[in-house]
């Protein structure tokens, strides 16, 4: 089984234009993501999928590989689907999708998803990771996506709101979605052909498209958190984390 890691990256973020090229300790964010992801064991290849020549030049400048996609992708997974076709991946190839705004991605989290597919081949088409929230302020932060799952660790829902809501207590675990996906190449193509979901559009969470159309998402719980850069002020948090590591 080939394992291809793809990092979708776009320049035109409404909250943070040029985010993939933002410097973190003197190195562009996309380079941090690429280099940390490449430390994961079991990868066949790794590419950045982008539609921007500036990002392409930066990635190639540090020795990374790039696949150029169109600017019309509706979501990161739609961009991944285009990259799959351009790279000529086989239906049973495993695709790992790491977001371009995760400069502190833990390589062992990537390995955890690969191992999940290797241990349970054919049992699911898509998987992702969660992390039990420690900082309670994150629970009500809409930029921190929360998730709930059933007893067999299949996703029930993802939301920017607090889920579940404890009517009589606030003392219960809440899980953050880490935003890293693994799926078969064939399923990515299936996903991209699905119409935009109503809940996906409301929450602006692409993974809800799969749930709305009856597809299961397997969940594994990670021991490590991942800091996503959503706003310029998150850069300082990343630099603090890197300094402490």
Swiss-Prot record:
InterPro entries: Cytidylyl_trans, KdsB, Nucleotide-diphossugar_trans
Uppermost EC category: transferase
A Gene Ontology cellular-component term: cytosol
Entries under SUPFAM superfamilies matching the protein: Nucleotide-diphospho-sugar transferases (SSF53448)
GO biological process annotation, one example: lipopolysaccharide biosynthetic process
Superkingdom of source: Bacteria
Keywords: Cytoplasm, Lipopolysaccharide biosynthesis, Nucleotidyltransferase, Transferase
Pfam families for this protein: CTP_transf_3 (PF02348)
Keyword Nucleotidyltransferase: yes
Name of the protein in question: 8-amino-3,8-dideoxy-manno-octulosonate cytidylyltransferase
EC number per UniProt: 2.7.7.90
Family per similarity comment: Belongs to the KdsB family.
Disulfide bond sites: none
Compartment(s) where it occurs, according to its Swiss-Prot or TrEMBL record: Cytoplasm
Cited function: Activates KDO8N (a required 8-carbon sugar) for incorporation into bacterial lipopolysaccharide in the Shewanella genus.
GO molecular function: 3-deoxy-manno-octulosonate cytidylyltransferase activity
Catalytic function, reaction form: 8-amino-3,8-dideoxy-alpha-D-manno-octulosonate + CTP = CMP-8-amino-3,8-dideoxy-alpha-D-manno-oct-2-ulosonate + diphosphate
The protein's annotated pathway: Bacterial outer membrane biogenesis; lipopolysaccharide biosynthesis
């Amino acid at each position: 089984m080939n394992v291809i890691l793809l990092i979708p990256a776009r320049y035109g973020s409404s909250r943070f234009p040029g985010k993939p090229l933002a410097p973190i300790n003197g190195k562009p964010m996309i380079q941090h993501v690429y280099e940390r992801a490449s430390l994961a064991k079991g990868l066949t290849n790794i590419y950045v999928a982008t539609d921007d020549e500036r990002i392409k030049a930066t990635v190639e400048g540090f020795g990374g590989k790039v696949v150029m996609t169109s600017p019309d992708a509706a979501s990161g997974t739609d961009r991944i689907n285009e990259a799959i076709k351009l790279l000529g991946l086989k239906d049973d190839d495993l695709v790992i999708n790491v977001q371009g705004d995760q400069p502190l991605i833990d390589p062992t989290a990537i390995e955890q998803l690969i191992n999940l597919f290797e241990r349970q081949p054919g049992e699911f088409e898509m998987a992702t990771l969660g992390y039990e929230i420690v900082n309670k302020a994150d629970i009500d932060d809409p930029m921190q996506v929360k998730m709930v799952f059933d007893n067999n660790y299949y996703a029930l829902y993802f939301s920017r709101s607090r889920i579940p809501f404890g009517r009589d207590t606030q003392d219960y675990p809440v899980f953050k979605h880490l935003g890293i996906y693994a799926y078969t190449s064939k399923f990515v193509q299936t996903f991209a052909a699905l119409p935009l979901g109503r809940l996906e559009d409301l929450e602006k969470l692409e993974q809800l498209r799969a749930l709305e159309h009856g597809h299961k998402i397997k969940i594994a719980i990670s021991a490590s958190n991942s800091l996503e850069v959503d706003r310029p002020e998150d850069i300082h948090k990343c630099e603090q984390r890197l300094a402490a590591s």
